[in-house]
Regions:
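Short, hydrophobic, well-ordered secondary-structure elements
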Residues: 23, 30, 44-69, 170-177
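Substrate-binding/catalytic groove segments of enzymes
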Residues: 138, 147-161, 180-189
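Short non-catalytic regulatory patches outside canonical folded cores
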Residues: 59-141, 148-153
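Acidic, Ser/Thr-rich low-complexity intrinsically disordered segments
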Residues: 200-224
């Protein structure tokens, strides 16, 4: 097994398998709350736990993706969405805008209007900022409210832990799914191989074949 294949198998065991475990926990909550947009504001302790776990994993994977494309980037503990958001925007912009279908009926685009750019400040240091017309995902901002001040009331008078709801959780899961699938596709392409990893139970990526008007479904990026 060469180095590229090792990177692929490491990703599957360290990241993709963990996603599937989180997804299994989410799937088990359907016994109590139907997966339906009518329940978008439903919140619970289980959703709170999963929301924080999924968003934390997005942060971890985002840094991994940036380090993969720019090995000089080192994770030191102070990096945030501005840093890895720049890497994701630069190297995977088209991929992350792909719509995701949840339980075959709910279409999500969690990275819509997402984009960061790098600029040099007056001292010549690289800084990161949102590109014109782009914005930080609302579900990510809500995650930070939950993470840092979950018992504090927001401007609407509601306690922040209520932001750990069905809508935000599905958006976060879809966001992680998109990153995982397309990064896995990158690793497969670099290794010039296909890895038959286990498929998601709840999420499917839809893409448009440039040579066809038909939409196709994809559960593994490497299958494109």
């Amino acid at each position: 097994m060469d180095e590229k294949e090792k990177q692929l198998t490491h990703f599957v065991s360290s990241y993709w398998d963990y996603f599937l475990e989180l997804e299994n926990e989410f799937a088990s909550t359907q016994k109590y709350v139907a997966f339906d947009v009518c329940n978008k504001n439903t919140y619970s302790i289980e959703y709170l736990k999963l929301f924080q776990a999924v968003c934390s994993e997005i942060d971890v994977l985002g840094k991994e993706i940036l380090h993969h494309f720019e090995p000089e980037f080192k994770v030191g503990g102070f990096e945030n969405i501005k840093h890895w958001g720049y890497g994701v925007s630069k190297y995977m912009r088209r991929s992350i805008l792909t719509p995701v279908t949840f339980v075959e009926k709910i279409e999500l685009t969690p990275w819509k209007k997402f984009g960061y750019e790098s600029v040099l400040d007056k001292n010549g240091y690289k800084r990161y900022r949102l590109e014109d017309g782009c914005e930080k995902p609302k579900w990510w901002s809500d995650y930070n409210h939950v993470k840092h001040a979950r018992t504090t009331c927001g401007e609407d008078g509601k306690v922040n832990y209520q932001l750990a709801n069905f809508s935000n959780l599905t958006q976060a899961f879809a966001a992680l799914f998109v990153l995982e699938q397309h990064y896995m596709g990158v690793l497969m392409q670099e290794a010039d191989t296909y890895y038959a990893a286990r498929e998601s139970r709840l999420f499917v990526i839809e893409y448009v074949d440039p040579d066809s008007d038909d939409k196709k479904e994809m559960s593994l990026a490497g299958a494109v």
